[in-house]
Structures are given as C-alpha cells and as structure tokens.
Amino acid sequence: MSVKIQDIRVICTAPEGINLDVVRVETNQPGLYGLGCATFAYRHLTVKHLIEEYLKPLLLGRDAENIEELWQLMHQNGYWRNGPIENNAISGIDMALWDIKGKMANMPLYQLFGGKVREGIPVYRHVDGKDIVEICENIQRFQEMGITHLRCQCGGYGGAPYGQTPGTAPRGAHDGMYLDSRKYIRDTVKLFGEIRDRIGYDMELVHDVHERVAPVEAIKLAKELEPFDLFFLEDPVPLEQTNWLRNMREQTSIPIAQGELFNNPREWKSLIAEQLIDFIRVHISQIGGITPARKLQIFAEQFGVRTAWHGPGDMSPLAHAANIHIDLAAPNFGVQEWSGIEPPNFVIQDLKGPHGALLEVFKGLPEFDKGYVYANDKPGLGVDIDEKEAAKYPCEKTITTWTQTRLRDGSLQTP
C-alpha cells in the first residue's frame, strides 16, 4: 500500500482564547489522515502561511511513511534553518505524519518508540496567588488532587500586571510588566521559606525565573533557595547567556532546568554534554516536532540529563499528547509540566475564551488522575479535532503584552 500525501491544511482555532494552529495531513488512502501541532500563538498566521504556501507544494505526492526523509527535506529546503516560524511549521506536519504512522500500525505512538517504561506520567502544575495565604490555599487544593510537584510563583513572574507603571519609572515610561529584580529575589526566597514552614518537605517544588533577572542575580537567587530543596530552578538565564550556567553550577547545588526557548541544537548540545543542566525543557514544536524531540531525549539520556518538556497553555492537546507519548517510552524522563487542559483548570480559566471549550474542540485528550497523566490507547497520537466546533472560536490578531517586561527604569527585559 503506497501512502501518498494528498493535501495539507491548517486549522486555526482559539477555544480558550489562545491561538492554536493544527495541521491536518490527508493521504490518498480513504479515511487515513494525521493531525499535528504547529502552534506559535503570537505569530500563528505566519506559520500558517509557511505551511500552506511553501511546505504543502513541497510535500504533495510524496510518501507519507518516510518521516525522516520528509523532515530533512522541510528543514533544508529554505536554506536558512531553524527558528520558531520554520520549526513550528515543520512540527505540525511531522506530528501529523507520526499520527498517520501510528494509525497505519494500529498502535499508540509510545509503542512505536519501544513501548512504555512507566504506566503514568507524574506532572507538575502551576500555583500562584497574590500572597502566601492564597498560595498555600491553592497548594492544598492541588494536594487534594494528588499532585506531588508544583511550580510556585507569587504574582506571576515577579512583575506587576501589565499597564501598572510604577512610580519608580521615569517620566514618559511605556506601559509594561515592571520588575524590580532585587525585590523579586527577596520575595521569592521569603515565599519558599514560608511554604516549607507551612507544608513541610513532602511536596516537590519548582520555580520559574523565566529569564527575568541578570545572570549574577540568578546565581544569587539559586544559592539563597538551596535550603528549601527545590526539585529544580527553571530557565534561570536567557538562552543568549547560557554560558553563565557554568558559573551557576560551580556555585550552587540547586538542580537546573533550561530550554523553553531553544530551537537550535547548538543551544543545547554543549549544555547537555558538559552536564551543565539537569533537565532539558524544550517546547517540542519549537524544535521541529516529534522527530528531533526523540533524538534530543536519547542524546540527553547518554549524559544523565532528564526531560521536563515545556507544557504550557499555548500549545494544542496534540502537542500535550506528543509529550506524553515520548515521556512514556523515555528512561530519562524527569517530570512533565501540565498546564491543566482538563477541568478544573486553574491556569486558563481567566482567559477570554469560554472555560471548557477546549474539550469540545479536541477529543481524546490525555487523562489526568491523582497526579498522573495517561495517554489513551487509540492509534497514533490519540487526539482528534471537531472542525465545526473549532470554527466557533476564531483566532485574533492582537499585540502581545505579557512579553513587554520592563525594569524599574523603563527599559525592556527578556520576558
């Protein structure tokens, strides 16, 4: 049976107020198609255009079973390689091709990766609050759900809400999320001290710096958080300054997770080979999909680096499912970020889309139960999309504001 690519379409939908790009690859075999995630929420139309105007003509009529060949073809065809636009576009098609292969084999994807080495995937959820009392109340709520790993923040990533320009800013300063990095460090250390005093050490805790402080300040924060036994400190430095991780490794024992913004192998190869990080945190669509993510996972395994794939709200359930399938077969799995795509969802509930709409658009979501996530055993990724429901939630072209982080003097800081 020769399986040829017959059509490629991009479905744009925003059921929870977040722009999602879903790729559908049709084949010449009746009823055989695959779905993948190409979501770059803040540039969704650019990714859609690249897929429909460039990658689709390149791939029509080609053998859908030759995933590696097609990935290399897409990766090299534009000459300049990598980057979030190209990689997300490639990812959508790559995931869809793996979905097709799983359906042809009548197996869930984890079986094609060698089978399960664990039955369920332990996840960490996000807990936030305006003060320590509210944060501890939210921690208790997650404990009752069976969660054993939590990412704790106070007021987001350390800044005031967008538009609240502080009095410390100069005249004429632009709106933004203003960050006082020194106060943020003091408050964060105090936060984890109080959390440990209240709940003890049975809960594994994570904190996301989100690259928002200078590298020397990140080292100071890491050292001061050591007594509170964090599971890891996430993205302490910007991807342009990861050379500072060597200094951090020499000065602190806190486990380091890095890589949310990586989209080029040069950004992670030396960090893993030199064991400067403990967890690799890439967003798999940002590096080109399942094909490169599997290679990265296997590479990291050789150096004792564990996976902790990025799992935010701004990726579709197809990408969440891809994470889970890789996790199930990965000996060096660490923990999985889980933004909570099922009710009760404490992350996306405040967005402008109707709560629960994601469940109407996507079917077959991975199941969360008592701290673990489970893939269903349907062939391929196991997730489908109802296009009629998806059409009810059109994407919007809006200016991204949460990335406009500013320091006290009004200058921009990496988000």
Show which residues each predicted segment covers.
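Shared catalytic-loop signature of beta/alpha-barrel
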Residues: 25, 49, 53, 69, ...
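Conserved, mostly hydrophobic/aromatic
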Residues: 5, 31, 55, 93, ...
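Extended hydrophobic packing segments that form well-structured cores
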Residues: 379-415
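Ligand-binding pocket scaffold of soluble enzyme catalytic domains
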Residues: 8, 20, 30, 35, ...
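Metal-dependent enolase-superfamily TIM-barrel catalytic cores that perform enediolate-based chemistry
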Residues: 120-247
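Structured beta-strand/loop patches that form or line metal/cofactor-binding pockets in enzymes
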Residues: 1-34, 39-40, 344-346, 359, ...
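Metal- or metallocofactor-binding catalytic centers and their adjacent structured scaffolds
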Residues: 28, 32-105, 414
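N-terminal amphipathic alpha-helix/helix-capping segment at the start of soluble metabolic enzymes
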Residues: 1-16, 22, 103, 107-120, ...
